[in-house]
Amino acid sequence: MEIEVKGHSGCQIDVINEKDGVFVYKSTADSKYLNRLALQAVKQQKAGAVEYQHIRVPRIYEVKQTDTQTIVKMQYVYSKNFIEFFEQAGFEQVEYLVGALKYFVEYEIGKSKLQTVSASVFQIKFSDIYKKVELNPLFVNNEDIKNILEKCKEVFSNMKDMNIPVGICHGDLTFSNILFNGNNYYLIDFLDSFIETPLQDIVKIRQDTAYRWSQL
């Protein structure tokens, strides 16, 4: 049995039934993403070495990287996606989820240190996003997007250096990157971030709860 799934990052995801079990293979042949996928696998391995309350991380079995392709072999988890979970969950199950995510983020904060981060780090990131949005044909004539970008531009241009916790984070902690297995929640698709801070995870999960960011 082999099932091919389209990944949100542009990676190919294959679910393959082998002699010793079912495994997930995540791969890319995109030269810009080869090293990133390998780094993300390492990040997932490190997170998987920690014991969290109700939070689990699929095991990474193998990472193969060549000049033309990166392939990551990992544990397959029988689970529900977030839509199936919330359709069937009662208040108790939702409370378990909230508690588990809270514990996970608090652990990250505890492993991080307050550091002064230069405003230029965020300004460079915003500049990169600004250029990508400008070049996106879907947004060229969208006045609302233009107004938002200009307001953001003003905010970032006046930004000062700030003290934030720097250390570890998932990088893309959204509901679409959580697999639901009973009262265990498997985090997938760890992302190497432009800055490793738990604030990334807080913002991402709030982005989901406030603006329904996740899509299947």
Q: Language model features by range: what are they?
A:
Residues 24-32, 75-77, 189-191:
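Active-site ExK catalytic segment of metal-dependent nucleases
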Residues 200-216:
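Active-site activation/catalytic loop segments of kinase-like enzymes and analogous catalytic loops
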Residues 66, 71-91, 132-138:
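A glycine-centered beta->alpha junction motif in the catalytic cores
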Residues 1-5:
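Conserved N-terminal boundary motif of the eukaryotic protein kinase catalytic domain
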Residues 13-16, 154-200:
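Active-site acidic catalytic loop and adjacent metal/ATP-binding pocket
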Residues 9-42, 83-84:
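ATP-binding glycine-rich loop module of kinase domains
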Residues 47, 80-129, 141-162:
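Conserved kinase catalytic-core helix
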Residues 49-65:
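Conserved HxN/HPN-centered segment at the entrance to the catalytic loop
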